[in-house]
């Protein structure tokens, strides 16, 4: 399984990858993107089986990235991992087609719960 982690913070991308490992969701190919535009280009060029994205990024926000994917017919499971988690953001995420929104600070258990139906061994 190919997992794309999109976040403008390299440190946060590393934390997300470590948390995947702690949630027993390791062993998958992980691809990183620094912003929504780079992430969109990577997905359109090579696909992904799961996308974990920050909400606020330069060039293209996470929600705009998700909307662009759906507009291009890409139905890859998409989950936000972000420092904010307002009800309005959750509603926008769901309306755009996200499977969930994990708020920072997060735990391995939160990842396991949110992603277990998507991530295969």
Role assignments for model-derived ranges:
Residues 10-31:
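Two-component/phosphorelay signaling modules centered on CheY-like receiver
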Residues 35-38, 61-64:
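Acidic catalytic/metal-coordinating carboxylates
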Residues 54, 82:
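Active-site residues of response regulator receiver
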Residues 57:
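Receiver (REC) domain active-site loop signature in two-component systems and cognate sites
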Residues 106-115:
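C-terminal output helix
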Residues 64, 85-100:
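Alpha4 helix (beta4-alpha4-beta5 surface) of REC/receiver domains from two-component response regulators
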Residues 46-52:
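Active-site beta3 strand of CheY-like receiver
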Residues 30-37, 108:
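Conserved Asp/Asn-Gly motif in the active-site loop of CheY-like receiver
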């Amino acid at each position: 399984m190919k997992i794309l982690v999109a976040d403008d913070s390299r440190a946060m991308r590393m934390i997300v990858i470590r948390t995947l490992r702690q949630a027993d969701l390791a062993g998958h190919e992980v691809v990183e993107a620094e912003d929504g535009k780079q992430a969109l280009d990577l997905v359109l060029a090579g696909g992904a089986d799961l996308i974990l994205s920050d909400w606020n990024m330069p060039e293209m926000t996470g929600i705009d990235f998700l909307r662009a994917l759906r507009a291009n017919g890409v139905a890859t499971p998409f989950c936000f991992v972000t420092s904010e988690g307002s009800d309005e953001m959750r509603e926008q995420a769901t309306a755009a087609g996200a499977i969930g929104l994990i708020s920072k600070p997060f735990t391995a258990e939160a990842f396991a719960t949110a992603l277990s139906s998507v991530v295969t061994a």
